[in-house]
C-alpha cells in the first residue's frame, strides 16, 4: 500500500534535513571547527536547529504514517503535514537569531501542537473501530468475547 501523504512529507523532511546539515557544514569549514561548536554562537544555534529537527521529525512521520494507514488519509493529515514542515522551516530561521523571537517560538509551538494533535488523533482512531486479534473481539468498556 502506498502512503502518499507520508511519502511526500518524508521526502520533504529528507530535503530539509540535508538543507539544515549544509547550513551547519558551511559554517564549520571557514571556522575550522570539525566537532562541536567551538564556542561559536551561530554554529551552536544552527546545530540545535538541526538537532531539534532530527528529534521531532521521526515521531511526526511515524504518527503520520500510522494515521494514514489507519484512516486512508484525509485533508486534515495533508494540512497537518504542510503546517509541520512550515513550522520546522520557521524554527530553523528563528534559531539564526539570538534569543526568543517570533519565528522560533511559532515554529516550535506549532510543531508541538501538531504532534500533540496527531498523538490524540492516533489514540482516538485506535479505539474507534476495535481490532480483532485471532478471533478475539476487543471492545473498550466490555470484556473480550470469542468471535466465530
Predicted regions located by residue number:
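Juxtamembrane boundary at the C-terminal end of a transmembrane helix
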Residues: 120-147
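Transmembrane alpha-helical segments that form the membrane-embedded catalytic/substrate-channel core
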Residues: 12-29, 85-94
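Cytosolic, membrane-interface loops and tails of multi-pass inner-membrane proteins
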Residues: 22-48
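Alpha-helical transmembrane segments
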Residues: 3-19, 68
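Mid-chain, well-packed structural core segment of small domains
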Residues: 61-63, 67-99
Amino acid at each position: 500500500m502506498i502512503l502518499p501523504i507520508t511519502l511526500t512529507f518524508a521526502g520533504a523532511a529528507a530535503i530539509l534535513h540535508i538543507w539544515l546539515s549544509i547550513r551547519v557544514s558551511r559554517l564549520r569549514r571557514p571556522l575550522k571547527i570539525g566537532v562541536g561548536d567551538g564556542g561559536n554562537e551561530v554554529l551552536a544555534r544552527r546545530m540545535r536547529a538541526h538537532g531539534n529537527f532530527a528529534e521531532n521529525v521521526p515521531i511526526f512521520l511515524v504518527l503520520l504514517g500510522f494515521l494514514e494507514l489507519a484512516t486512508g488519509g484525509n485533508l486534515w493529515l495533508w494540512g497537518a503535514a504542510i503546517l509541520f514542515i512550515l513550522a520546522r522551516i520557521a524554527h530553523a530561521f528563528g534559531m539564526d537569531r539570538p534569543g526568543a523571537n517570533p519565528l522560533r517560538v511559532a515554529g516550535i509551538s506549532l510543531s508541538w501542537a501538531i504532534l500533540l494533535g496527531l498523538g490524540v488523533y492516533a489514540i482516538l482512531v485506535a479505539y474507534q473501530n476495535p481490532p480483532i486479534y485471532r478471533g478475539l473481539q476487543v471492545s473498550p468498556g466490555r470484556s473480550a468475547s470469542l468471535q466465530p
